[in-house]
Amino acid sequence: MEKAIRNFLSQESAGGILLMAAVILAMIMANSPLSGLYQGFLHTEMQVRVGSLDIDKTLIHWINDGLMALFFMLIGLEVKRELLEGALSSREQASLPTFAAIGGMIFPAAIYLIFNYADPITQVGWAIPAATDIAFALGIMALLGSRVPVALKVFLLALAIIDDLGVVVIIAMFYSTDLSAISLVVAALAIVILVGLNRKGVTALAPYGVVGLILWIAVLKSGVHATLAGVIIAFCIPLRAKDGSSPSEHLEHSLHPWSTFVILPIFAFANAGVDLSGMSLGDLLSPVPVGIALGLLLGKPLGVLLFSFVAVKLKLAALPEGMGWRHIAPVAVMCGIGFTMSMFISSLAFIGDGEAYGDLARLGILTGSIMSAVIGYFWLSKVLPEKGEKS
């Protein structure tokens, strides 16, 4: 189990560094003579037509609706494994990261709404600073190498997984519009078939893939965000077969490098390019970017620390063995690294009348995430022992 966790963390850490490179490249492209090429490429129309089925979207929408469905499938597989056998499988293990994640979602949303309470168009972005980018956070932590105890990495991992689950619920409840009854019925039938496959003990992944594709198309057409199909498929794939093998873990291990080194960097490159040329100081200090940046930089650590402190004082949770508040505090700051997850919610929140706020939102995400990464890194570096020393 420990080896699996170490492998997971090493992949996520390397992926976080690659994500940083993708964000930097996107910013360079968006603010150079290549800007037109960058935007034109992302808005290239791509159509798939099979009989009466017609899916016509720009490349950036294929990335956000299609590739990210695979990423959310991986999240679903991770959540299922951790709930049944991993770091969230017992109340003692799950309590602290659960309370921390809840606080870390409430406080950033509240701070954002304080700055945007008067504008109903920008209010819809309240969930943007509530997310944590697990790959980026672990990537920053990886820069400190073996000085970081595995227990601290597992705490951040568990917190981020619960945070991701919260994001899934938020997307389902608040960012689904113009629902199609027929598509929802087809999606429901697909879910029934997936559950039936699970109950019948079907461990071959191909049937889940075929029905899962139907589910993804139905959800895409229904008005509910298509990425949720990935989570549903993941929850239906068996964790254990009768012979002791794990179809779920096999798929998770197969998806992980693709998600870490292909899907998320492509998503970051497609969504992080903010054109700064037309922005004024007033734009930079407007409610949307300020609310997001402060939500990530202040709201995240305040929520994580306050809810964790109260839970420990009420004996509802306990600190990880060998860890103190001086270790938890900089990790709480690192939870303010929103990046890809925050950008994903931003792409759902600011559409239609609010589309003009998209660049401002991404600017706030980049500002808050970078500041959280820098402060969290140096703070954690200061409290951790040097190599060869004991904490």
Curated annotation (Swiss-Prot):
The chain crosses the membrane at residues 14-34, 59-79, 95-115, 124-144, 154-174, 177-197, 213-233, 261-281, 292-312, 331-351, 363-383. It is found in: Cell inner membrane. One of its GO terms (molecular function) is sodium:proton antiporter activity. It comes from the Bacteria. Keywords: Antiport, Cell inner membrane, Cell membrane, Ion transport, Membrane, Sodium, Sodium transport, Transmembrane, Transmembrane helix, Transport. It comes from Shewanella loihica (strain ATCC BAA-1088 / PV-4). InterPro entries: Na/H_antiporter_dom_sf, NhaA. The gene is nhaA. One of its GO terms (biological process) is regulation of pH. This is Na(+)/H(+) antiporter NhaA. Na(+)/H(+) antiporter that extrudes sodium in exchange for external protons. It catalyses: Na(+)(in) + 2 H(+)(out) = Na(+)(out) + 2 H(+)(in).
